[in-house]
């Protein structure tokens, strides 16, 4: 299946902010590290029939480059150093790093190459896959249906929050990777801009064009890669946390907690890390249980939780965000990142549950265990056992 009308992507910045934040850190600290990443469809969708159309889009991505106005805008942000931006200016996607195949109906994608380059593929490639699939499956759906669905949800949201002080409710768009389309995401974000509690987007292209704050710090791959970069597996998570602070000592300080598990993370997150990092991000497991653990941990360390921020981003919708806000708002600062339930929330459209995750670093296995068993990713069961032993984790979960 080929012949999609035009390139899905129009900007190198049409990606999540944390990709550029991590890429700069990799550029400065791990320039020669090699990685492999693989696509996973967590649902039962057979997407192999779209392999040729995806390949066309991958090949078209080599023509994307940082435009002068984009370069100038990035230069005005506090996150980036000149040497990195000069390098990014010359960056081009290399389609040879991407292998796309149809394996009896199953879509297989494997990415290999220098981490500093491979890191850029994940988010735009997932957005491409999502948009292509929805284009073929739901050709009559689009912006109008998405906007109608959002307006209906906002009416419910207003009723749900009528008795609440919403002055500390902060919502972000995290919807790039599984969006229905680029146009739908832009329309949804522009509508949300009218709400006082909407604070930004993870999409750098939208942030630039709509004058929004770009939101994001680091992803699982930052911690996964350190499982092989660090000489000692048991201290690899601490090495990842320290390296991030080395790159960003005073900003972008929200740490992702579930690459191993929340309990293993908190054992590594001592008073020095907890003091320097501005907060934590939840991405798997029970959110209330996680939040209670985070608050108790700060209190145990003598840190006032109200000086820290908890970011919730796992399978959220507006109703779940309000429930969490009710539970935690008086005890800690809060932000909520909603993705699929904003940018692919259309009646009769089934969002894709798709990911691309790191599987190797410097030719050796890495793993994500998480606080949700179904999210465990690793080929090498022996490495998963070693990882669990290194982090003193009791039960064994199946590696997928």
Swiss-Prot record:
Origin species: Salmonella arizonae (strain ATCC BAA-731 / CDC346-86 / RSK2980)
Alphabetical keyword list: Ligase, Phosphoprotein, Pyridine nucleotide biosynthesis
Organism taxonomic ancestry: Bacteria, Pseudomonadati, Pseudomonadota, Gammaproteobacteria, Enterobacterales
UniProt GO MF annotations: nicotinate phosphoribosyltransferase activity
Modified residues annotated as Phosphohistidine in this record: 220
GO biological process assignments: NAD biosynthetic process via the salvage pathway
Residue ranges of the TM segments: none
Cross-referenced Gene3D superfamilies: nicotinate phosphoribosyltransferase
Glycoprotein keyword on record: no
GO CC term, one of those recorded: cytosol
EC number(s) stated in the UniProt entry for this protein: 6.3.4.21
General function of this protein: Catalyzes the synthesis of beta-nicotinate D-ribonucleotide from nicotinate and 5-phospho-D-ribose 1-phosphate at the expense of ATP.
Classification via PANTHER family: NICOTINATE PHOSPHORIBOSYLTRANSFERASE (PTHR11098:SF1)
Protein known as: Nicotinate phosphoribosyltransferase
């Amino acid at each position: 299946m080929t012949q999609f009308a035009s390139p899905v992507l129009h900007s190198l910045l049409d990606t999540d902010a944390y990709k550029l934040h991590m890429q700069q850190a990799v550029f400065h600290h791990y320039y020669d590290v090699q990685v492999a990443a693989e696509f996973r469809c967590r649902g039962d969708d057979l997407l192999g029939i779209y392999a040729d159309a995806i390949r066309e889009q991958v090949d078209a991505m080599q023509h994307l480059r940082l435009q002068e106005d984009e370069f100038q805008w990035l230069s005005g942000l506090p996150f980036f150093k000149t040497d990195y931006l000069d390098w990014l200016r010359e960056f081009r996607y290399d389609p040879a790093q991407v292998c796309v195949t149809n394996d009896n109906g199953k879509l297989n994608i494997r990415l290999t190459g220098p981490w500093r380059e491979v890191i850029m593929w994940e988010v735009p490639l997932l957005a491409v896959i999502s948009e292509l699939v929805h284009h073929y499956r739901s050709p009559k759906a689009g912006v109008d249906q998405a906007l109608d669905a959002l307006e209906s949800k906002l009416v419910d949201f207003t009723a749900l929050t009528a008795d609440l002080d919403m002055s500390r409710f902060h919502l972000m768009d995290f919807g790039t990777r599984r969006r229905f389309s680029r146009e739908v995401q832009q329309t949804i974000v522009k509508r949300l801009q009218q709400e006082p509690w909407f604070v930004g987007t993870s999409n750098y292209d939208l942030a630039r064009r709509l004058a929004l704050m770009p939101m994001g710090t680091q992803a699982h791959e930052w911690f996964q890669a350190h499982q092989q970069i660090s000489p000692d597996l048991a201290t690899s998570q601490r090495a990842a946390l320290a390296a991030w602070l080395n790159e960003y000592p005073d900003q972008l300080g929200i740490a992702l907690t579930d690459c191993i598990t929340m309990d293993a993370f908190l054992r590594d997150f001592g008073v020095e890390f907890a003091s320097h990092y501005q907060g934590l991000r939840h991405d798997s497991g029970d959110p209330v249980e996680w939040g209670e653990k985070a608050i108790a941990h700060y209190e145990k360390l003598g840190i006032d939780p109200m000086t820290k921020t908890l970011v919730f981003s796992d399978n959220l919708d507006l109703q779940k965000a309000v429930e969490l806000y009710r539970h935690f708002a008086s005890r800690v600062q809060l932000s909520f990142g909603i993705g699929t339930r904003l940018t692919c929330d259309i009646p009769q459209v089934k969002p894709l549950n798709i990911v691309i995750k790191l599987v190797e670093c410097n030719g050796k296995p890495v793993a994500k265990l998480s606080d949700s068993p179904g999210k465990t990713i690793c080929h090498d069961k022996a490495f998963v056992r070693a990882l669990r032993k290194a982090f003193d984790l009791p039960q064994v979960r199946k590696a997928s």
